[in-house]
């Protein structure tokens, strides 16, 4: 099939790689280049890097308001547009162009977690499973009929990164199956149950702050779901400490307040009081320091007993 691929981050690369091997990629659309943190070097998206390495035609429009661009897409005579974490919403004029429409890979079991950050949300909300949905694209965000879905279990050892990496490979394989069904005319798409729809908004910095008045399980899930992106944090004496890994501790400290450092556990880390128990911080990054283990936090005396995270 003749395919236009639209994507941007690392998550989209396995999908483009597999489609490139089995189909004709007419062009690749990705978000505009961005300067790095210091503003001295332009960073290409992972999808652009792949496209350049394989001599694929690249487009990086700010939007799809240019009639000339719409006409150029129309002249490509694509059978299908495939979208994987592109980061832009397509207008109806583009959706209507390809012979077989536009399909999207979404990293949740729709209709749960439409929108941004569904991988983070699944872990933060304590879900025991997540997955991939391949769906048709409509004007309404993530509302199209679902072509295929595949599930994966979420364990207590999973973080955003581990689930992200698992889903990006699962998604690439499922996408190829969906394209084959479309090619053969064997798609039996299912409408989403509107009663089960939930949404996830992009995370703001303030959304990443840990609320120590929540339960140990809730905070444990929150930190895992933020690891390593966008990273959960707390304030400590006017500085920021990013927290990457914790373990649920059985011990309850009734005389302490939530967020208080209550104990050092030798060989494990620093214990912090929660609403129903405590957590052991086993990996964190104090402001202007490198990421370190809980043991190194103790040895460096970065968190003292009696201090409070807030």
Swiss-Prot record:
CDD domains: FMT_core_Met-tRNA-FMT_N, Met_tRNA_FMT_C. (6S)-5,6,7,8-tetrahydrofolate binds at residues 108-111. One of its GO terms (biological process) is conversion of methionyl-tRNA to N-formyl-methionyl-tRNA. Gene3D superfamilies: 3.40.50.12230. It comes from the Bacteria. The lineage of its organism: Bacteria, Fusobacteriati, Fusobacteriota, Fusobacteriia, Fusobacteriales. It is an enzyme of class 2 (transferase). Its EC number is 2.1.2.9. Attaches a formyl group to the free amino group of methionyl-tRNA(fMet). The formyl group appears to play a dual role in the initiator identity of N-formylmethionyl-tRNA by promoting its recognition by IF2 and preventing the misappropriation of this tRNA by the elongation apparatus. It catalyses: L-methionyl-tRNA(fMet) + (6R)-10-formyltetrahydrofolate = N-formyl-L-methionyl-tRNA(fMet) + (6S)-5,6,7,8-tetrahydrofolate + H(+). One of its GO terms (cellular component) is cytosol. This is Methionyl-tRNA formyltransferase. InterPro entries: Fmt (IPR005794), Formyl_trans_C (IPR005793), Formyl_transf_N (IPR002376), Formyl_transf_N_sf (IPR036477), Formyl_transferase-like_C_sf (IPR011034), GART_AS (IPR001555), Met-tRNA-FMT_C (IPR044135), Met-tRNA-FMT_N (IPR041711). It comes from Fusobacterium nucleatum subsp. nucleatum (strain ATCC 25586 / DSM 15643 / BCRC 10681 / CIP 101130 / JCM 8532 / KCTC 2640 / LMG 13131 / VPI 4355). Keywords: Protein biosynthesis, Transferase. Belongs to the Fmt family. One of its GO terms (molecular function) is methionyl-tRNA formyltransferase activity. PROSITE patterns: GART (PS00373). The keyword Zinc does not apply.
């Amino acid at each position: 099939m003749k395919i236009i691929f639209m994507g941007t981050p690392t998550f989209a690369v396995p999908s483009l790689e597999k489609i490139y091997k089995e189909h004709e990629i007419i062009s690749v659309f990705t978000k505009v280049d961005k300067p790095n943190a210091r503003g001295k070097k332009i960073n290409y998206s992972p999808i652009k890097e792949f496209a350049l390495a394989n001599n694929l035609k690249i487009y990086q429009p700010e939007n799809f308001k240019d009639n000339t661009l719409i006409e150029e897409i129309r002249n490509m005579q694509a059978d299908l547009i495939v979208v994987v974490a592109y980061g832009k919403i397509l207008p109806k004029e583009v959706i209507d162009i390809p012979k077989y429409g536009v399909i999207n890979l979404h990293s949740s079991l729709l209709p749960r977690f439409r929108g941004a950050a569904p991988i983070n949300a699944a872990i933060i909300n304590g879900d025991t499973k997540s997955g991939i949905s391949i769906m048709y694209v409509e004007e309404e965000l993530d509302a199209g009929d679902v072509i295929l879905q595949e599930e994966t279990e979420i364990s207590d050892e999973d973080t955003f990164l581990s689930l992200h990496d698992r889903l990006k490979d699962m998604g690439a394989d499922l996408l190829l199956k969906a394209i084959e069904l479309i090619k053969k005319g064997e798609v039996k798409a299912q409408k989403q149950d509107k009663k089960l729809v939930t949404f996830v908004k992009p995370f703001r910095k303030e959304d990443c702050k840990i609320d120590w008045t929540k339960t140990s399980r809730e905070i444990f899930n929150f930190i895992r779901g933020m690891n390593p992106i966008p990273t959960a944090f707390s304030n400590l004496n006017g500085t920021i400490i990013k927290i990457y890994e914790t373990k649920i501790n059985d011990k309850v400290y009734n005389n302490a307040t939530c967020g208080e450092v209550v104990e050092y556990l030798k060989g494990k880390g620093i214990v912090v009081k929660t609403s129903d128990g405590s957590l052991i911080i086993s990996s964190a990054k104090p402001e202007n320091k490198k990421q370190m283990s809980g043991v190194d936090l103790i040895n460096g005396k970065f968190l003292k007993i009696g201090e409070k995270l807030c």
